[in-house]
A protein has these predicted regions:
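Chalcogenol-based redox active-site neighborhoods
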Residues: 1-169
Length: 169
């Protein structure tokens, strides 16, 4: 695709917000759905959440990340939900999801308040984007896996995140 953004240079640090470690209690956060309506993380309290975090649907690695998690979502139990979060406007997210047939994950925007990004330490302050990573939160609200991808051009470790979910059984 020719409309993709290149974020590979320079490196941007994840400078804003607290970073989590496995075993921490997950914070409640609020993001926006495709109709600009707020969605609270507590809506998924009885499910295991895989939170896929990425800068923008208009980058090639982010597209790959969403496509991969969409494919994986179809193979997971019904008590697992994948949330895909960026600061893209919901309209751009809808366009991307339609074009790439993303229909097994729930794509939400953190653009308004950076609520998730600030609470989980994923904000790239200089760009007002989210960094790349994955968070797994169990049904009890405990972070069971977290990855902050240090090189934004790299994909997250999908296998490690999915293994963490399987081990919750």
């Amino acid at each position: 695709k020719t409309n993709l953004i290149d974020l590979t240079n320079p490196q941007f640090p994840l400078a804003s917000g607290d970073q989590f470690i496995e075993g921490d209690r997950a914070h409640r956060f609020e993001v926006l759905d495709g109709n600009l309506q707020p969605v609270a993380s507590t809506q998924f309290k009885d499910k295991t959440m895989i939170i896929s975090v990425f800068p923008s649907v208009d980058t090639s690695v982010c597209a790959l990340q969403n496509i991969r998690f969409n494919r994986e979502a179809a193979r997971l139990d019904k008590d697992v939900v994948i949330l895909s979060l960026s600061v893209d406007l919901p309209f751009a997210q809808k366009r991307f999801c339609a074009a790439e047939h993303i229909d097994n994950v729930r794509v939400y925007s953190d653009y308004r308040d950076l609520d998730f990004g600030m609470k989980y330490g994923f904000v790239i302050k200089e760009l007002r984007l989210l960094g790349r990573g994955v968070v797994v939160v169990d049904r009890k609200g405990i972070v069971r896996y977290i990855e902050y991808v240090s090189e934004i051009k790299n994909e997250p470790d999908y296998d490690a995140a999915l293994k963490a979910v399987r081990e919750l059984k």
